Curated annotation (Swiss-Prot):
UniProt main location, coarse: virion
Name listed for the protein in its UniProt record: Nuclear export protein
UniProt-listed GO biological process terms: exit of virus from host cell nucleus through nuclear pore
Keywords assigned by UniProt, alphabetized: Host nucleus, Host-virus interaction, Transport, Virion
Oligomer and partners: Interacts with protein M1. May interact with host nucleoporin RAB/HRB and exportin XPO1/CRM1.
Originating gene: NS
Family: Belongs to the influenza viruses NEP family.
Record's miscellaneous remark: Average number present in a viral particle is estimated to be 130-200 molecules.
Compartments in which it is found: Virion; Host nucleus
Source lineage: Viruses, Riboviria, Orthornavirae, Negarnaviricota, Polyploviricotina
Amino acid sequence: MDSNTVSSFQDILKRMSKMQLGSSSEDLNGMITQFESLKLYRDSLGEAVMRMGDLHSLQNRNGKWREQLSQKFEEIRWLIEEVRHRLRITENSFEQITFMQALQLLLEVEQEIRTFSFQLI
C-alpha cells in the first residue's frame, strides 16, 4: 500500500472526527466507520494480490468474495455520493477541503480495488 494513501486516510479520518455537523454527527460517524472499513478491505485485497498463492485460500475461505467486492463498490458509490452532497451543502472552507480530499481519496481507492480485483480474477 502506498504510504501517501495511508497518511491520507489517517489525515481525513482525523479531520472528519473534528468536524461538528450538528444533528448529522451520526451520519459523519457512519462515514468515518465506512472509510475505516474500506481501508481495511483495500489493504486485505492488496495483500492477497502480493501473495498470489493466497488467492486460492481466499476463495476457499470465502466463496462469496465476489459478493463482498460488489458490496464494497456499492459502499464506495454511497460514500462518494454522501461526500459530494456534504461538499455541496457546506460553507465552511475547512470542511470543503476535507470533503474534497475525501472524494479524491475515495476515487483513488475505488481504482485500486478495481485493479486488485482484476488481478485476482
